[in-house]
Regions:
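Conserved P-loop NTPase motor core
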Residues: 1-266
Length: 266
C-alpha cells in the first residue's frame, strides 16, 4: 500500500494541490482589496453577489470573492481571520464533501464560508448540530459576521426560536454574551432567515410537524436547499438508528373505528 501511495500519491493530497490550493491563492490575492472596503461597501457585496447570480453566474464563480468577503467580515466582527486550511475546509464542504478537522482547527469558523456562499441563493442554508447549546452558541458567535454582510441568522431549539439581533439584549442573561442577542420569533421566521442553526432532531421533527399541517400558512420550514452537518458520523450513523416519531391524539380514529364497526355487520 505504501508503494502504491508513493507511486500514485495520496488522493486527498492530489485534491488539495490541484483543486483547492489554486483557489486559496485567488482568495488571498483579494485580501488587500477587501481590507480597504468601508463597512458600507462590504455589506453591499452581498447584494452585488445576488445580482451576479441572477444574471447567470454560478456560486463557484463567486466563491473566491464571497470567501474573501466573509474572511474580512470575520476579522472585523469577531477578530478572527480564516487561515488557508480553513478556506480549504470551506471549499470541501461547499462541494458536498466530508471535511475532518481536528480540535482547535476552528470548524465553527470554517462553516461560515460555505453557509454564506450558499445563502446568497436566498433559498436558505442550515447548520445541523448535535445539541441545542451548540446551535445557539454557533449562531450567536458567528451571527455578527453574517450581520456585517447583511445576512440574517436564525436558530431553532427544543423550546424556542430566534433571530440574531445585536441590538436586542435578552433580559434573562445566559452567562455568555454570545447567547444574549436572539430576538424571539416564530419558527417560520427562523427558517426564513438566510442561515438557520439547529439540531438534527429539531429539523427532523419540524419536518414531520409540517407534514401534519393542513394549511400552507401553518408550515414552519421552506424547501430544503443546503445543509452542513456537524459531527456527521454521529448524526448520520450513530443517531440514525433512533427513529423520529411524532403522533397525534387518536380520538378521531377511535370514533371512525366505532362507526365502521357498526357498518360492517350490515
Amino acid at each position: 500500500m505504501s508503494f502504491l501511495s508513493k507511486l500514485f500519491g495520496d488522493a486527498n493530497a492530489r485534491y488539495v494541490k490541484s483543486a483547492l490550493a489554486p483557489m486559496v491563492q485567488d482568495i488571498n490575492s483579494l485580501e488587500p482589496e477587501f481590507e480597504k472596503f468601508s463597512e458600507g461597501e462590504l455589506i453591499l457585496m452581498t447584494a452585488k453577489f445576488r445580482e451576479r447570480l441572477a444574471k447567470g453566474e454560478t456560486l463557484d464563480d463567486l466563491l473566491p470573492e464571497a470567501f474573501a468577503a466573509i474572511r474580512e467580515a470575520s476579522r472585523r466582527a469577531i477578530g478572527k481571520r480564516h487561515f488557508d486550511v480553513q478556506l480549504m475546509g470551506g471549499m470541501a464542504l461547499h462541494q458536498g464533501k466530508i471535511a475532518e478537522m481536528k480540535t482547535g482547527e476552528g470548524k465553527t469558523l470554517v462553516a461560515t464560508l460555505p453557509l454564506y456562499l450558499n445563502a446568497l441563493t436566498e433559498k436558505g442554508a442550515h447548520l445541523v448540530t448535535p445539541n441545542d447549546y451548540l446551535s445557539r452558541i454557533g449562531a450567536g458567535w458567528m451571527g455578527p459576521i453574517y450581520y456585517l454582510l447583511g445576512i440574517s441568522t436564525g436558530v431553532v431549539t427544543n423550546d424556542s426560536s430566534g433571530l440574531y439581533d445585536p441590538n436586542y439584549e435578552d433580559a434573562h442573561g445566559h452567562g455568555d454574551s454570545r447567547l444574549n442577542h436572539f430576538r424571539p420569533c416564530t419558527r417560520h421566521e427562523a427558517y426564513a432567515a438566510y442561515i438557520t442553526y439547529g439540531t438534527n432532531n429539531e429539523f427532523g421533527f419540524d419536518y414531520l410537524r409540517d407534514n401534519l399541517e393542513y394549511q400552507p400558512s401553518q408550515l414552519r420550514q421552506r424547501e430544503h436547499h443546503f445543509a452542513i452537518v456537524d459531527e456527521v458520523d454521529s448524526i448520520l450513523i450513530d443517531e440514525a438508528r433512533t427513529h423520529l416519531i411524532i403522533s397525534m391524539p387518536d380520538t378521531e380514529s377511535a370514533d371512525l373505528y366505532k362507526m365502521f364497526a357498526g357498518i360492517v355487520p350490515q
